[in-house]
Structure formats: structure tokens, C-alpha cells
């Protein structure tokens, strides 16, 4: 069975070190790739209704089984509205509500977590669902848990023992604005715990984290823990034998909002 998770895309903010035109070109390039992947899949999973996680078009999903975050339970007002709009577009599809559910397609089992906070407890961003796919290997896609800031979510990941872990990391590009240094400390602590206690083959640490060219310095304790233990902690770009665009952009075009910074050490916070 061919599965696509969260087929959506959004343009980066101006803190991303690539000119607007180049960012638009990248969006166009990867949106075409995403659309082709959806056309070629059997099952599409949508963990929540932010537009970087789904394209709200009906025709795109024709004939696909849709496994989606519940559109009415554990959902904020904005996403509830988007979910209703999306469901109106895909009425003819076979639809399953994902929250805390389990389905099997041939030899592939897809399990979903209970609704998880999109960041800190009580956040206005609402909830997402994590995805566990089991076949020859176990893959855990956390969706947007923003860190994780919440230790319970780190423990859940450790207990699942995935071979491949895809995790979004903290939104450090919002550090000192929407994201606090205390939450960065929690995220680093929880990521280190996951690295130390999970015998994964690969951990893809990406999404929110890779919007900030300082990411390796801010999370150096996580990367150093991985290196010390021989764990493969990499970005999605590196998994595909490419260099992260945020680093390439910084090298080519220079800094945006962060001109200087230091490595972040949690014991000083």
C-alpha cells in the first residue's frame, strides 16, 4: 500500500534566508511533487488542518482512502472550519477518522495516537494526531508536537520503539516571541531522552526546526548526544543526500533576523 502523510505546503517567512522569488519557485517545485505523490498513493493521511499539512482540493484525492483528524472533536475553531470545508470537497471518498484508531491495509498496519497538543498544553493551535506505520519496519510520524515540549509525548515515542522517527522539532524561529526559552529547554531535554532511550535507525528532525539557520547551535546538545551514541539524527534533506536549504540560503545570501548568536546550553537557563 502506498501512503502519503500530510500532503500540504506553505511558503517560508522572511526570516528564511532565501529571497521571496526563490522561495516561490521552491513552493511550486515541491507542490508538484506532492500532488504527484497523492495521485500515486492509495491512502492519504491528514493529521490536522493547517495548510502546510493538506491541500484543500477535492479532485486531488479522487479514489483515495482518507485517514483524517476528527473534524469535530479535539479541534479548535479555525481547524474545525477548515475541516468542514475539506470534507465538503471529498464527500465521495472513503473516510476514516484517525484519532486513536487503527486500520490495516494488507500487511501494513496504521495506528494513530490520541489527539496531541500542537505545542504546549492548552495551546490555541489545537491538536494533531501522530501516525505509526508498521510493516517490515516501524515508522513514527509525530506531526506537529513542536519539540516535543511535553515529556509524556517523549515517553510515548520511547515506548513505541520506532526504527524510523520523523519529528518536527521546536519552532526556534519564534524563540523569544511566541516560543519561550523555558520551552526550548524542555524540548532539548525531551529530544535527548528520545535519542538516549530509543534504538532507532534514523531520526529525521525537521519541519519547524529547519526554519532557523541557527538550529544546530541551538540544539547542539541533541546532536552531540546522537554523535556520542552513534545515532543517526539528520534532516529530511540529508536523508535525501542534499544539504538543508536553510543552511545553503544562509551561506549564499547571509543572515536575516539573527546576525549573531551563541550555542544554547540548557544548564544556563
Where are these regions (language model features)?
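P-loop/Walker A phosphate-binding loop and immediately adjacent motor/lid segment at beta-alpha junctions
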Residues: 1-3, 12-14, 56-77, 181-182, ...
Amino acid at each position: 500500500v502506498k501512503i502519503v502523510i500530510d500532503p500540504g505546503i506553505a511558503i517560508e517567512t522572511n526570516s528564511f534566508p532565501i529571497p521571496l522569488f526563490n522561495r516561490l519557485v521552491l513552493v511550486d517545485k515541491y507542490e508538484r511533487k506532492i500532488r504527484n505523490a497523492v495521485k500515486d498513493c492509495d491512502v492519504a493521511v491528514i493529521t490536522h488542518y493547517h495548510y502546510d499539512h493538506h491541500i484543500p482540493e477535492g479532485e486531488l484525492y479522487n479514489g483515495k482512502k482518507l485517514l483524517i483528524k476528527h473534524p469535530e472533536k479535539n479541534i479548535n475553531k479555525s481547524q474545525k472550519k477548515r475541516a468542514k470545508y475539506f470534507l465538503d470537497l471529498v464527500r465521495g471518498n472513503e473516510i476514516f477518522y484517525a484519532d486513536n484508531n487503527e486500520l490495516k491495509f494488507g500487511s501494513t498496519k496504521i495506528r494513530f495516537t490520541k489527539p496531541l497538543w500542537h505545542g504546549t498544553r492548552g495551546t490555541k493551535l489545537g491538536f494533531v494526531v501522530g501516525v505509526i506505520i508498521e510493516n517490515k519496519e516501524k515508522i513514527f510520524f509525530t506531526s506537529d508536537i513542536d519539540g516535543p515540549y511535553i515529556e509524556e509525548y517523549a515517553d510515548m515515542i520511547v515506548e513505541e520503539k520506532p526504527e524510523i522517527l520523523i519529528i518536527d522539532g521546536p519552532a526556534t524561529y519564534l524563540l523569544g516571541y511566541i516560543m519561550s526559552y523555558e520551552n526550548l529547554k524542555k524540548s532539548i531535554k525531551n529530544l535527548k531522552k528520545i535519542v538516549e532511550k530509543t534504538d532507532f535507525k534514523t531520526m529525521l528532525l525537521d519541519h519547524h526546526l529547519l526554519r532557523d539557520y541557527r538550529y544546530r547551535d541551538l540544539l547542539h546538545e541533541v546532536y552531540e548526544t546522537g554523535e556520542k551514541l552513534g545515532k543517526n539524527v539528520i534532516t529530511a534533506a540529508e536523508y535525501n543526500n542534499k544539504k538543508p536549504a536553510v543552511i545553503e540560503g544562509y551561506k549564499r545570501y547571509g543572515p536575516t533576523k539573527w546576525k549573531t548568536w551563541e550555542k544554547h546550553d540548557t544548564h544556563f537557563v
